[in-house]
Amino acid sequence: MGKVLVTTALAYTNGPLHIGHVRSTYLPADVYTRFLKMRGIDAIHIGGTDNHGVPIALQAELEGKDPEEIVEKYHEMIKEDLERLNIHFDEFSCTCREFNPDHVDMTQWFFKRLYEAGYIEEREVEQLYCPECERPLPDRYVEGVCPYCGAEGARGDHCEACGRYLEPVQLEEPRCVICGSKPEVRRTMHLFFKLSEFEEDLKKWLESNDNLPKNVRNYAIQWVREGLKDWDIVRDLDWGVPVPLEGYEDKVFYVWFDAPIGYVTFTKQYCDRVGQDWKDYWFSEDTKIVHFIGKDIIVHHALFWPAMLMGVGATLPYTIVAGEYLTLEGEKMSTSRGWVVWVKDFTKLFPADLLRYYLIVVSPLTRDADFSWGDFRDRVNNELVANLGNFVYRTLSFIYRFLDGNVPEAETDQEIVDKIKETHQRVTEHLEKFRFREALTEVLRLSKFGNEYFQEHEPWKLKDEDPERCAEVLRGCARIVKALAVMLAPFLPDSAEKIWQSLGYEDSVHDVDWEEALEDVETKEIPEPEPIFPKVTEEDLEKAKALLPEESGESEGQDDEYVSLEEFNRLDLRVGKIKEAERVEGSDRLIKLRIDIGDRTVTAVAGLYPTYEPEELVGRKVVVLANIQPKEMFGVRSEAMILAVGDEPALLTIDESKREVEPGERIR
């Protein structure tokens, strides 16, 4: 394998990091890069902060500060938050024009290449202008009523209620957020990136790139099918990267034009520091570029950014890993309401590895997940403390107490050798395919096996009855402990290091090869063992819950007779295709269905018999609610719900007279 360039979405410097940011983007990228490096692969992790655009300019204006002050403050806070969680970067920089002139140069280099190639076009546009403030009103400088859903408070670039991207002139009843007055429409010249010219190339790339996850591919292809529109890449603003074109001296690039170029800027800065050529990463077929992002910016990374790369002849992403949303105690996180867990607050109460563990195992990355303090306590205490920590501590404590603190010289049961090899192979395969939860679960299964092996062979009896066999059992357990330390290193770096040092090793587990997990443990003296993980107590939980307001405020002011658009948008309604159907044993009406919903196949139990025979359901496309609480019925776990009409159910059908609809497409 050649070089691997791992990037994480640039953190926007208008606030510190919360656990949702960590789960979707930074943690999986860190795990993946650590894994690659342990395998001896030439991999680097590039990241930083995104510092331009209207939100920062507006925040600075409202606070009476310079944008640079906002950027500098939150850049340092974000960097510290990432360090608190042991998330390591080979290069961590910023896009701020005042602090990083290299990024200005790189952004303008991209623009000039695209301009010279004919992909940039000048057009006259309408924009809102505030006569009171005597200024244009780009993006969030204006609010109003969404023209699509009627929600009040829609911003000039986006409606939070229905998720639509907007232009300021589309808003109904617009008002300037600075002075509150009604703006007027004026005309000005802007520059457009001709995204439409890349429509066919993007479609081919999306459909042929098997490395792209389904949640990314399906979402991006849906945009392509609806027709790509050319992209306005400048703003009438004084905060951003200047446009190097005559007549545009008072304008800057749109933040989503310059932000992804930050990946290239930071790579060049890394290469300049270590004496490499940045084009070996961005203009080489031997490099795999892996982007880790949140699902809210799929369109930017799967359409806009690849088109820009095509336009300059650069390497396209190998894959784009998009983490889904994280809720908090069943409610959408909200920084404005304080319904959020900040990284800094968490790490004051608990070790970083506890958060890393929970965010990985709570749900696959490609599914929405919920952070619950009660579930966090249960998983830490039952899985880390009672399973993994217990096995390591009881093994090493027994060796320390009864074998003079020396790992015994003995043979290892073949059963253990085989189990370690099998686990190592599965963990490797899962990580190669970005299945982080499944990989870490396999490691925990190995420690569970170790506990069962220890309990079954009763070394506390063998030490007196059969010392030779006792030595074999304990050496086998110590070998499992070593394998656990190595395979945990990408996931739980601090805990893996503790386990490694507990075996008497003086080097770092982060400096050993991934294959070291398969090697025998060394015969050496160990230090007195200490517990690896702290137990989460009720007192700890009370302190943690005190960080949140008593109520999330999610339903404040809502009429119980109505469902808000925000509530409706929490429903994950998709097109599903039934792959298998069979009667549920013991039930008169239930049919068990296996349904393809794009990024995964789910099981649903539905009362469709005798209206429908199982055979006639296979191949049908149906409407699926994909994020309903799972429920067990007649011994079958139902993970989704299909929608139908009436007590004698009539399935809703999908109109495909205009185009074919794919499993996984969202219903909105």
Curated annotation (Swiss-Prot):
The keyword Cell membrane does not apply. It catalyses: tRNA(Met) + L-methionine + ATP = L-methionyl-tRNA(Met) + AMP + diphosphate. Zn(2+) binds at residues 146, 149, 159, 162. This is Methionine--tRNA ligase. A motif ('KMSKS' region) lies at residues 332-336. Residues 567-668 form the tRNA-binding domain. NCBIfam families: metG (TIGR00398), metG_C_term (TIGR00399), PRK00133.1 (NF001100). Its EC number is 6.1.1.10. Belongs to the class-I aminoacyl-tRNA synthetase family. MetG type 1 subfamily. Pfam families: Anticodon_3, tRNA-synt_1g, tRNA_bind. GO terms for cellular component: aminoacyl-tRNA synthetase multienzyme complex; cytosol. The lineage of its organism: Archaea, Methanobacteriati, Methanobacteriota, Methanomada group, Methanopyri. ATP binds at residue 335. It comes from Methanopyrus kandleri (strain AV19 / DSM 6324 / JCM 9639 / NBRC 100938). One of its GO terms (molecular function) is methionine-tRNA ligase activity. Its cofactor is Zn(2+). Binds 1 zinc ion per subunit. It is found in: Cytoplasm. Homodimer. PROSITE patterns: TRBD. One of its GO terms (biological process) is methionyl-tRNA aminoacylation. Is required not only for elongation of protein synthesis but also for the initiation of all mRNA translation through initiator tRNA(fMet) aminoacylation.
